[in-house]
Amino acid sequence: MGALSIRAAGPNDDETLFAIHRESAMAAYVEIFPPDRYRFPDAEMREVWALALRDGKTSVLIAERAGSPVGFATVSPGWLRNLFVVPTEWGRGAGAALHDEAVVLLGSGDASIAQLWVLEENERARRFYETRGWRDDGGRSRSGFPPHPVELRYALRLGEGRRAPPGRTHPEPPPTQGDELRG
């Protein structure tokens, strides 16, 4: 399996982000956005990831196992914007490692509370975040993508989330460790 490492994304990682996002979203959201009715927005997402790498406000972390990208997280001041992991890595610690590093980044800013949006129907992601100290704060929105499912806003008081020890290399998790996908 090999050790997992986390690195900062570079300016040319937009296609890597797109590929991970597409693969993980197609697996995680199959019941929410059935692909026979709702096509994945390829062109729009390619542009989103290209802009995220250039905007100067977004930090992007990429998880790699044996040199291959397996997941990523995006953070902007006070917000965990995205956390996606390829399905073959679900339950293997990549999501937990990305989350922990993202929380460290969030804690290094001025915010005392971090927030994220998660799809209400994505129970797996909700459990993942709740296990790590995130709580539904009552905020509600609708996804910008048809069929416009409900999104829940979760909050984490920084300093209370589960974090990895300092460092950016993570050993293999025990077989029972949970790992989820951002909603």
Task: Label each PLM-derived region with a short phrase.
Residues 1-15, 158-176, 180-183:
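Conserved N-terminal entry element of GNAT/NAT acetyltransferase domains
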Residues 62, 68-79, 84:
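Conserved beta-strand in the GNAT
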Residues 116-126, 143-148:
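Conserved beta-strand-loop-alpha-helix junction that forms the acyl-donor binding cleft
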Residues 46-62, 79:
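A short helix-loop-beta-strand connector motif used in the catalytic cores of GNAT acetyltransferases and
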Residues 89, 93-101:
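Conserved acetyl-CoA pyrophosphate-binding loop and the N-cap/start of the following alpha-helix
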Residues 64, 83-91, 118-119:
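A short, internal acetyl-CoA/4′-phosphopantetheine-binding micro-motif in the GNAT/acyltransferase core
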Residues 22-48:
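Conserved GNAT-fold acetyl-CoA-binding loop/helix
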Residues 106-117:
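Conserved GNAT acetyl-CoA-binding A-motif
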